[in-house]
């Protein structure tokens, strides 16, 4: 194979490469065997036309496109490897010449990975808005949340107050005309929960069972239903019942009801403190890691980030998100309908972070290369075992989904992140 590379601009160039007759001939044979199955020519049984007759009737050139599709991927990859290029986007392939009996000549317009000039990435000093300390108030708040989960609703006489639940019928209208989604029967609404649009719940404070209240509100300007956004509306609301929470006493019996592994309230609080400390330690470490990586990226210089890399990252993130939705039984159409958004909105959302994610990956990859990080066979096997355990899969299933190169890359990236974070200190 003959290959050459011509720089056209920063991170852009043209690869010129050839495909030899040794590669072309077997590809032509494969192409002929594929197309002859569908050939129905007088004088021959379907699929049994000799190659010589095919060449006379259609010309060998009729096989070139199919043959090229067979040999191109491998030939292109070989050219990239021979030139030592790190290509980051799909190439634009052009045929220069495909003459019978001669090597085929092609060009590939490519985008290459930008140069990363690393700055400081070790012994960084960072600030984080996180703490490992757990206060008594945080422990008490967790107990109180669990206590409220065990609360029972009982019907009460008198006026509804914040925190009470009202059972209501409501009919909404704009300019006297009812609108879709503005009607409900026997709906349980906790006042102060923020379930309804601003201003609605507050107007039911002080109401009593049996009353009908006109609730006047204005839909927010950014309301998901565009035909209602910014408009004044009236909800004729009938209160059937007012219910209040009856929370259990804060004692040892409550503790046992919450967690059957404890005997006293003090034991429950001690258990919650350990859980909160563990969660806070993880959150603190994550915050340090995020801040250290962000500083390492800021200290580095990336020579002209190709827009194709950002574009590919946006689509990768969108496809991953929509794939997760579909695994939960939510189609893209259903998601956009439920959220009142469009594919363009989702694209903009991911576009905002794509540039940062691409730069971060490039810098971490550059650190891994600078440190000479590689994955051992033992580390690869451990990664496979860990992933299999995490996702409840067989190890062979993981091997089938992830190539060895992907696993090696991920392990090297983790080592680079560890270099950044393990030496970082908090101001």
Curated annotation (Swiss-Prot):
Subcellular location: Cytoplasm
Catalytic activity, as annotated: [protein]-peptidylproline (omega=180) = [protein]-peptidylproline (omega=0)
One Pfam family cited in the UniProt record for this chain: FKBP_C
GO cellular component, one term: cytoplasm
Keywords linked to the UniProt accession: Cell cycle, Cell division, Chaperone, Cytoplasm, Isomerase, Rotamase
GO BP: 'de novo' cotranslational protein folding; cell division; chaperone-mediated protein folding; protein transport; protein unfolding
Superkingdom in the source lineage: Bacteria
Function as written in the Swiss-Prot or TrEMBL entry: Involved in protein export. Acts as a chaperone by maintaining the newly synthesized protein in an open conformation. Functions as a peptidyl-prolyl cis-trans isomerase.
Protein name (record): Trigger factor
């Amino acid at each position: 194979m003959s290959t050459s590379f011509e720089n056209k601009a920063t991170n852009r160039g043209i690869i010129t490469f050839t495909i030899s007759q040794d590669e072309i001939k077997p590809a032509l044979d494969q192409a002929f065997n594929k197309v002859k199955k569908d050939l129905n020519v007088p004088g021959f049984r379907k699929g049994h036309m000799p190659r010589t007759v095919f060449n006379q009737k259609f010309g060998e050139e009729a096989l070139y496109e199919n043959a090229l599709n067979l040999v191109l991927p491998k030939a292109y990859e070989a050219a990239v490897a021979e030139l030592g290029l790190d290509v980051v986007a799909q190439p634009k392939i052009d045929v220069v010449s495909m003459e019978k009996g001669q090597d085929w000549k092609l060009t590939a317009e490519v985008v290459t990975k930008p140069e990363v000039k690393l700055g400081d990435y070790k012994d960084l000093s960072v600030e984080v808005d996180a703490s490992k300390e757990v206060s008594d108030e945080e422990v008490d708040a967790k107990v109180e949340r669990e206590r409220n989960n065990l609360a029972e609703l009982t019907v009460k006489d008198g006026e509804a107050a914040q925190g009470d639940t009202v059972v209501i019928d409501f009919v909404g209208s704009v300019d006297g005309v009812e609108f879709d989604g503005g009607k409900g029967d026997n709906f349980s609404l906790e006042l102060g929960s923020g379930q309804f649009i601003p201003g609605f719940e507050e107007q039911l404070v002080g109401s009593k069972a049996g009353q009908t209240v006109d609730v006047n509100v204005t839909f927010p300007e950014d309301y998901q239903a565009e035909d209602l956004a910014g408009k004044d509306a009236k909800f004729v609301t009938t209160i059937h019942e007012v219910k209040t929470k009856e929370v259990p006493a804060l004692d040892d019996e409550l503790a046992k009801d919450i967690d059957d592994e404890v005997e006293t309230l003090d034991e429950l609080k001690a258990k919650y403190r350990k859980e909160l400390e563990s969660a806070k330690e993880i959150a603190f470490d994550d915050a340090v890691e995020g801040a250290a990586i962000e500083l390492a990226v800021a200290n580095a210089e990336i020579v002209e980030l190709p827009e194709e890399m950002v574009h590919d990252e946006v689509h990768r993130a969108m496809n991953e998100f929509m794939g997760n939705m579909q695994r939960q039984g939510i189609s893209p159409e259903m998601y956009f309908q439920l959220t009142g958004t469009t594919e363009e909105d989702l694209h903009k959302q991911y576009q905002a972070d794509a540039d940062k994610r691409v730069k971060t990956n490039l810098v971490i990859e550059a650190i891994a290369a600078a440190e000479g990080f590689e994955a051992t066979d033992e580390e690869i096997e451990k990664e496979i075992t860990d992933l299999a355990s995490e996702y409840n899969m067989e190890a062979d299933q993981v091997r089938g989904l992830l190539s060895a190169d992907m696993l090696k890359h991920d392990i090297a990236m983790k080592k680079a992140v560890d270099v950044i974070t393990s030496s970082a200190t908090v101001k």
